[in-house]
Amino acid sequence: MRVSTGSALISDGRMFRVTVAALGVGQQRRGERSLLVPFERLQSLMQTIALQGGRITAITPVAEAGSASEAAPAAAAEPAKSPAAKAAPKAQASPSKPAAVSASHADVPVNLYKPKDPFVGTVTENYSLLADGAIGRVNHITFDLSGGDPQLRYVEGQSIGIIPDGEDANGKPHKLRLYSIASTRHGDDMVGNTVSLCVRQLQYEKDGETINGVCSTFLCDIEPGAKVKITGPVGKEMLLPEDEDANVIMLATGTGIAPMRTYLRRMFEPAERQKNGWQFKGKAWLFMGAPTTANLLYDEDFERYQSQFPDNFRYTKAISREQQNDKGGRMYIQDRVSENADEIFSWIENPKTHVYMCGLRGMEPGIDEAMTAAAAAKGLNWSELRPQLKKAERWHVETY
């Protein structure tokens, strides 16, 4: 029987309040925070905070927890100052054959929880990812997945469904919405029983009225402690290759950064590398598109990776309202791809290179145009080559 509670029951009822300095994720998480954790998670949390550069200032026992719902799981600890790449991988043969797909991909969990019988998770944190002056509203939201039977587990590159509370205009429950997962399989706190999302509130005009998206607004407004119906996980299109020597090109706009964040944390966060035993040795190149600098998501973390892993990670930004392309127009991600098309193509010629694209569907035509020109310069036809890459499981696209 499925037990959908927000927090796992602890063995002896003891709870501890842990006060930590410099706790959180990226530039939005600073200062001192207090976390309420069960005894069984205390040692794991302490190790994670130490590995990621946080500082525990106090640990205080509190009254016994009367029920699972009273225990608020630990929030994400700020990533430690860990290593960030620039050198292009050596080109090998043409991109006709895929790098071997690990057998572990056959074990990827899918649809552990379905809409008719969803898992009920608990919100542990919800905070803005945007700096002052940003456009719109984007939040980082974390859910506790403890207590499920089966355990709701997932891997990098998958999505989960959220069923918002309430009913539609016809009196029926709202339909689920899928969101790309923004945390690794270990969660932001490395405990292994949380999942995080990166959610932009959808807003559009209709008949002179501003309409807010049902599920995105539900999530951006939700408070810690609230219960949320979750389905999934789903998806095998965006899975990260298991090959430690693979090369990864990432093209993202807006909240399409979510799966890319999971890849990069798995590659470069010290606590991740220690826990999963997966030591990335290849090259990774992230192209990120945003309207303003204030809208760059997880930017501080990516800058840190680039500075600390210069041989393995490269970070290229396209900020449309602040930068100009070579024609004097706004700088979009497709313009950055066009600028670097020859180098990107040299990466793609290496059969170990995978390309991931996630974000607005409007980015695809421009990227295709840039790749078409680069391929033509080499006497190749991009419209024929792209399906070959897709068939070889090296071209991964998730746009909306």
Task: Label the model's feature ranges.
Residues I56, V123-N126, I181:
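Conserved hydrophobic positions within beta-strands
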Residues A252-P259:
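Ser/Thr-glycine-rich phosphate-binding loops at phosphate-binding pockets of nucleotides
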Residues V62, E70-P83, P115, I135, ...:
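Long, low-complexity, charge-dense
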Residues R2, G6-G13, A21-R29, K86, ...:
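Reductase modules of NAD(P)H-dependent flavoproteins
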Residues T19, G24-V25, G31-L35, M46-L51, ...:
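Basic nucleic-acid-binding interfaces
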Residues P38, A103-K114, E167-G171:
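Short aromatic-glycine motifs in intrinsically disordered, low-complexity regions
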Residues F143-I249, R265-Q274, S320, Q388, ...:
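FAD-binding FR-type
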Residues S67-V108:
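Long, low-complexity intrinsically disordered regions
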